[in-house]
Swiss-Prot record:
Catalytic activity reported: a quinone + NADH + 5 H(+)(in) = a quinol + NAD(+) + 4 H(+)(out)
InterPro entries: NADH-Q_OxRdtase_suN/2, ND/Mrp_TM
Protein name stated in the entry: NADH-quinone oxidoreductase subunit N
Pfam families on file: Proton_antipo_M
Keywords per UniProt: Cell inner membrane, Cell membrane, Membrane, NAD, Quinone, Translocase, Transmembrane, Transmembrane helix, Transport, Ubiquinone
Organism: Methylacidiphilum infernorum (isolate V4)
Amino acid sequence: MNAFFVFCTPECFLSLSALVLLLWQALAKIHDKSIGILVLADYLVAGVLLLPFVENQGIFWNGLYVWDKMAVLWKVFFLITGFLVSYLSLESDRLIPKARSEFYILPLFTTAGMALLASVRDFILLFVGLEIVTVSFYVFVAFQREFPSALEAGVKYLIIGALASSFLVMGIAFVFGITGSTQFDEVARFAQNNPVNGPLILGLVFILVGLGFKASAVPFHVWTPDVYQGASTPITTYLAVGSKAAGFVVLLRILNLPFYDPGFQKHWIPLISLMALLSVIVGNLAAIPQRNIKRMLGYSSISHGGFLLMGLSAHNKIGCAAVIYYFFAYMVAIFAAFLVVILLEKNQPSGVSIKDFNGLYLKNSLMAWSMAFSMISLAGLPPLMGFFGKLMVFFAAWDSGQHLLVIVGALCAAAGLYYYIGVVRAMFWTEPDNVQRIDLSPATKLLLWILSVGSILLGFYAEPVIKLVGSVLS
């Protein structure tokens, strides 16, 4: 691994950029908005630096770090996520006036940690990457110190996050104690040549508990609605997409290498299936009575975690491809939804409820249509991208014999239509209290158009995207 390649990796470039911006801000006192724009430029430059190495493959740092097509795909995903979160931060008016520049800069470290997780091949590096991400969110969630709800959310996230990290470390300790190594290859080799014993299974269970927190999977979901509601909306979006994806990219890595042996599979497949079943049931049913939009989307996120776990439980190539495709569909829909929420928060600083969407079509038709496409995609209705994501997950799970899981998942998806369509009904068929127009900047209009049209086109042309994901996995 030469020095130029190391510099061009997103985790290295973004970390160095963040350090430079922090020092520059401390010495030169740059305007906060200028810092935010520079952060957006950093994400674009990181994406450009990635291009020459897309086809590269290799294992580096004595087996700790892998560079393959799947790693590149997830790094691109995290760069897009970081870029969009930074734009949402610039658009949001609810941030604290003090230390706003740090609010723009710190996500660079978070994205670097997520990019590192895309390439992990060792449990120690896995823990380091997850802690970079988790500790960053401890700061972000409680950033709005003047709001009691933000402090409450921050404390809850800190306590449960620390507990999850403890389980993860304990699981890694069990795996190391039995196999004598933390490298994925060595653990897989040990499982092939030796019977999988009780302590090793216990280590696997502890690791799944730790990662279940990141995925907001039931029964490790209790923090999700409160933290989503209490955190600032850009950070809620980052938790819903980036943090969840970080947990799943690690699950994809460990379940398909160190724990791929049939001796492990007969234990983790039922556990993953149970978490998937509980998540789709609890997430969808708990979302129905919610009136706060962020809390509703928090429970919705739990249900989507269940559908993603359904793809993992299939333990086949189709299931892994379904998880990746589903995440891209989910990212597009969630960012469109939360961008609309941020725009509404300018007039509702205390929080946006479902009734605040009443007559949105009359106030700004682009916002209404963007939110409608987002809700329809999250609900899994054709022909949008979210429909094909759910269809792939169901097909993969059915093909692997998880028939009950698919039937329950389909019923829960149907139940979820109630709260998704409720938002659409409020925007188009409910009279508003006032018809005050909402004006948007040209950049925000463009982003809403891109997210809306992207969800439609990637639904109509899902086949080439699915083939691309399949080629990455091959």
